[in-house]
Regions:
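Hot-dog-fold acyl-thioester-processing enzymes
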Residues: 1-47, 108-145
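Hydrophobic beta-strand-centered segment that forms part of the acyl-chain substrate-binding groove
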Residues: 34-75, 79-80, 94, 106
């Protein structure tokens, strides 16, 4: 089971030389996608316990469009191991607003983390095995139509 959120990276999110966005930007998107996954799997937002690994593989810049994927790796009684991947799918070409859809996504960040649901909230999966991709700035987009 997985969920995917897509988001435009505003130029105002970049505050390092080279129009770079900090790594915490991607981790916040992982939190949103992970919460969505937990709601899909358990009907509860869950509590995030922490990351066991995080790899920053490529820079994210203002003007990019990224997608954050949260994929259920394993499910215990109350714990959920989640694999995350942040991919750049569009890239700003210059400072005039021109941009391009990338032929192949660039993997920017990978992580693995653990979420925990309260004992009274742990339930069997309630949704189909593959959730529809979601879009929206807040990560709370609507199902694709």
């Amino acid at each position: 089971m997985k969920v995917v959120h897509q988001r435009y990276v505003a130029h105002s999110d970049a505050h390092y030389a080279g129009n770079l966005v900090d790594g915490a930007f991607g981790l916040k998107l992982f939190g949103d996608a992970g919460t969505h996954l937990a709601i899909t799997v358990d009907g509860h937002e869950s509590l995030f316990a922490g990351y066991s690994s995080v790899e920053f593989l490529a820079p994210v810049r203002g003007g990019d469009v990224v997608e954050a994927e949260a994929r259920l790796a394993s499910k215990g009684t109350r714990s959920r191991t989640v694999d995350f991947e942040l991919r750049i799918i569009c890239r700003s070409v210059d400072d005039t607003g021109r941009a391009e859809v990338l032929a192949e996504p660039i993997v920017a960040t990978r992580a693995r983390g653990t979420a925990v649901v309260p004992a009274d909230a742990a339930t069997p999966a309630r949704c189909p095995s593959e959730a529809a991709p979601m879009a929206g700035r807040s990560g709370a987009g609507r199902p694709a139509r």
